[in-house]
């Protein structure tokens, strides 16, 4: 299958990129810059991953999305949630932290942008980095979302593009394990909400990745602030 991969440079999208290569021809990796805090880090990580796998890479600029987003993922004056590891699976708390980093219709917008390229490049699928952990509080991370988006694209694309995530039913531990099997270059990824010199080790994205690595007895990538 020919595919376009949405690549943020983070854990989920990087593993999906690596897996998509085993399933067919990845014609393009797309990174979206919506002025998120970690934009420059995500773009750099995505570019390195695309270069590593010899895949064309393109950055799409969406500055207006930052203008209408009022949450901490974009607004530097807002405090990012820093849940403790033991709080990650508490749904009520997770729902609150999700609301603090929500971006309006983000994944809906992203998969449709990718579908434009997929149609033009004669690709059957758009690959996105979803996971079942965050699907509990982010409905646009669910298999149901992918199916609904695919259904709409039966009408909106000439070649009936579908949305697919190879990790949509996996938790972070399983995703890291899959990345290990695929020999993913962990040192190239960026899975932090912040855009500092090193991944902070405190935000929810970092916490979920740290828990996954520790549960598998793996050392964290060297670009973590909190390394063993």
From Swiss-Prot:
Subunit structure: Homodimer.
Known catalytic reactions: 7-carboxy-7-deazaguanine + NH4(+) + ATP = 7-cyano-7-deazaguanine + ADP + phosphate + H2O + H(+)
Binding site for Zn(2+): 192, 200, 203, 206
Metabolic or biological pathway, per its Swiss-Prot or TrEMBL entry: Purine metabolism; 7-cyano-7-deazaguanine biosynthesis
PANTHER family to which the protein is assigned, alphabetical: 7-CYANO-7-DEAZAGUANINE SYNTHASE
Any one GO biological process: queuosine biosynthetic process
Cofactor: Zn(2+)
Name of the molecule in the record: 7-cyano-7-deazaguanine synthase
Binding-site positions, ATP: 7-17
EC top class, as a word: ligase
Record's keyword terms, sorted: ATP-binding, Ligase, Metal-binding, Nucleotide-binding, Queuosine biosynthesis, Zinc
UniProt cross-references to NCBIfam families, sorted A to Z: 7-cyano-7-deazaguanine synthase QueC
GO MF assignments: ATP binding; ligase activity, forming carbon-nitrogen bonds; zinc ion binding
Note accompanying the cofactor annotation: Binds 1 zinc ion per subunit.
CDD domains in alphabetical order: QueC-like
Protein role: Catalyzes the ATP-dependent conversion of 7-carboxy-7-deazaguanine (CDG) to 7-cyano-7-deazaguanine (preQ(0)).
Top-level taxon in the UniProt lineage: Bacteria
Family: Belongs to the QueC family.
Record EC number: 6.3.4.20
Family annotation (Pfam families): QueC
Lineage of the species this protein comes from: Bacteria, Bacillati, Bacillota, Clostridia, Eubacteriales
InterPro entries: QueC, Rossmann-like_a/b/a_fold
